[in-house]
Structure formats: structure tokens, C-alpha cells
Amino acid sequence: MNKKYVIVVFFLISILSSVLAQGGLKYRGFSGGMMIHTGYLKSNSFDLQTIQGNYITTSNVEGIPFGIGGSARLHFGKHLRVGGEGYVSNLRYGIQGTTASVSWGGVLADCVWELGRLWPFVGVVAGGGAMEHIILQDVPADDFVVENNVSYREYTFMALSPIVGVEYALSEKMHLTFKMDYVIKISNPQADFPSGPRFFLGFMFYRLDD
């Protein structure tokens, strides 16, 4: 894993540890909801070849993904939230309609500060997922004919994802949520894995004790 990513994750863990040391961890309730997302993702370059090993072209995954997912959290004390989240990001690129799909989920821990209606938060997710990549070299026709020059790849990975965001309390029970993340793959390195910032928007529903 890149050194700068290690520094970012270490910084987030330090914030979590510092906040935990400041107060109690009494259970306060829970929250959860759904979000849509987009962003900008890009992979390293990789070579495509025939079954015989002949070079075809060099390509890379790059573009604007769209996806959906959600999260659920248990609230402890004034700041700590622990739970889980999961998302699917789909990306189409190239004139042939090549598709890349990243499914990802894990254990979530973050810290939130209640500043009136604004609730900024920072945290990290640790988990894993799967990458599915269907590479087309010809524009597919709308028929039932099997296409030539198709590559299908699927693999799993482990990852960390630092997150930062803010919630706006529309009411005691519903918040408008915006956040940003960056999935950092820490196992099974692959040239076609797309990385980059993703931006999320959605609603979280709350049930907290006063």
C-alpha cells in the first residue's frame, strides 16, 4: 500500500482514538439509510492480448461511476459510531460499452460532532469486495449472436476506505447526508482496479436517546 495512504489511515485512527479517550461510550441508539454516488475513477494501464498471447492494445479503466448502497450505525457516547456499509459502483467506458463493477463493503467506525444542525464526521471502513470487468473490443449488436474478442475478469480484494462528510439535520429523525470516500485496495494488486474519489448523497434515519 502506498505510504501516503498509510499516513491518511493512521491519521484517521488517531482521531478515533483521541475522541474515544474524551468521553464515555454509553449506547445512544442507531441510524441508517441509503445513498447514491458518483465520482471519478481511473486504473493503471494494462495490455490486452489474444488467446495465443498476441498483443491487441493497451487500455485502462477511466470514467464517472454511478452506484447505490447504504450504511447502518450504532451510536456510543457523544461521538463514536460503529456499524457497516456496502455499495456497488458501476462504470461504463469506451465506445464498445466496456463495463467495470466494484462491489464493496465492510465494518465502519467514525466520529461525529453535533454542531447544531450540521454534523460533520470522519472515519474509516475496513472490509473487502469484488471487481467484475467485462472488456469488449467490438461494439455489440442488439442480437443473440455471441460476441468475439471479449475478456471477462473477476477477482476479490481487501481494502480500507477513509471517509469524511457532513450531515444536515432536517429533523430529529432524518438527516440529509453528503460524504466522500476513497477505496484503497490492500491485497491482490491488479492493473485494472479503478481508484479515485467518490461522492455520496442520501438520507439517514435516526433513533437516538436524548
Residues covered by each model-derived region:
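Residues that define the transmembrane beta-barrel architecture of outer-membrane proteins
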Residues: R28-F30, E62-I68, T99-G105, L118, ...
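Transmembrane beta-strands of outer-membrane beta-barrel proteins
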Residues: S31-G39, E85-Y87, F121-G127, K179-D181
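Gram-negative (and chloroplast) outer-membrane scaffold detector with strong preference
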Residues: L74-V146, M158, Y168-L170, G202-D210
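Predominantly the C-terminal beta-signal and adjacent terminal strand-loop region
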Residues: L160, E167-D210
